[in-house]
From Swiss-Prot:
Gene symbol of the encoding locus: rpsO
Keywords associated with the record: Ribonucleoprotein, Ribosomal protein, RNA-binding, rRNA-binding
Superkingdom classification of source: Bacteria
Entry GO terms, CC: cytosolic small ribosomal subunit
Record Pfam families: Ribosomal_S15
Protein name, per record: Small ribosomal subunit protein uS15
Signal sequence coordinates: none
Length: 89
């Protein structure tokens, strides 16, 4: 259910500040968004998979916390990130 190594590397390259930047808030939010989108497709087929749904809610909560942190620290980076990811906030 996780992302492939190539998909993660592409996200890190697109959103990171450097080639090995996997810890910045932008990269973490982008990785969580990709995993959340993947799980949403999973739940269209497996409606009763409550164990994975709990993991999805945990990921959504973590993404919200990271976005709130980024908004508090640097509003310009926050707005550009939500536009690039297509989030509604």
């Amino acid at each position: 259910m996780s992302l492939s190594v190539e998909a993660k590397a592409k996200i890190v390259a697109d959103f990171g500040r450097g080639t090995n930047d996997s810890g910045s808030s932008e990269v973490q939010v982008a990785l969580l968004t990709a995993q959340i989108n993947h799980l949403q497709g999973h739940f269209s087929e497996h409606k009763k998979d409550h164990h994975s749904r709990r993991g999805l809610l945990r990921m959504v909560s973590q993404r919200r916390k990271l976005l709130d942190y980024l908004k508090r620290k640097d509003v310009a980076r926050y707005t550009s990130l939500i536009e690039r990811l297509g989030l509604r906030r």
